[in-house]
Amino acid sequence: PILLIGNAGCGKTSYALELIKILQGKPGIKIDLGNSVANFTCTGSDPSYKDAKKGIIIESMFAGNDNKPIKNPIIHFDELDKIHQDEKYSIETIFYSILEKNTAKQFRDNFFGVDVDASGINYIFTANSLKTVPVPIVNRLKIFHIPDYTEEQFKTSVLDNFYQKWLKINNLKTECFPEVLSDEIKEKILEICKCDSRAVNDAITQVFARTIVYDDAKDSHIALFSAR
């Protein structure tokens, strides 16, 4: 299990999601620990309870397209530093067992009432800081520190990647927009986002909104520049 740690907006979560997609060929299971996640999210809940369901551990092992078991799926736990330790059903207690190979070999899903070998599951954690992460959990993880993006990195690669995703998300015709971002456009985007990856999409939208018009002939939005 690994932990990617770095300041907010450094790209660690995006990297984890892309890495999982590359390794598995599809998106993996992502759990946001900042949302007060209970331990039965992993272990499953008692079938006698209303809305009971299986846990994500066993779910991940049968998440293949053909429903055949997967020995080594990947689960992503985001915002480990926001884990709620003082709650009765804190997920923290589960980490002590699933992050140890020996105990993970006999992991029990409460919904099905069976033990499964979960020792092959891979875990990627992301966090902004180690300060609030329990030491026993830290000791079970291989830690990688992710540095902030430099302005040069933003200009040469980050903005281009975000721009291509922005076009796809907004279903915009690429022939009506710049194939690549010019230095002028990048400067305008950087003025708004301040090298914060979380603000890039909004910054791109703001810059292009100043220039976009609708072309009836092409039945599409087109981008005109300069963005000043």
Predicted features and spans:
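AAA+/SF3 P-loop NTPase mechanochemical coupling elements
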Residues: 67-72, 107-126
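Walker A/P-loop
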Residues: 1-32
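AAA+/P-loop NTPase substrate/partner-engagement loops
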Residues: 22-56, 154
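Conserved AAA+ ATPase small/helical "lid" subdomain
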Residues: 168-223
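Conserved catalytic/switch belt of AAA+ P-loop NTPases
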Residues: 77-116
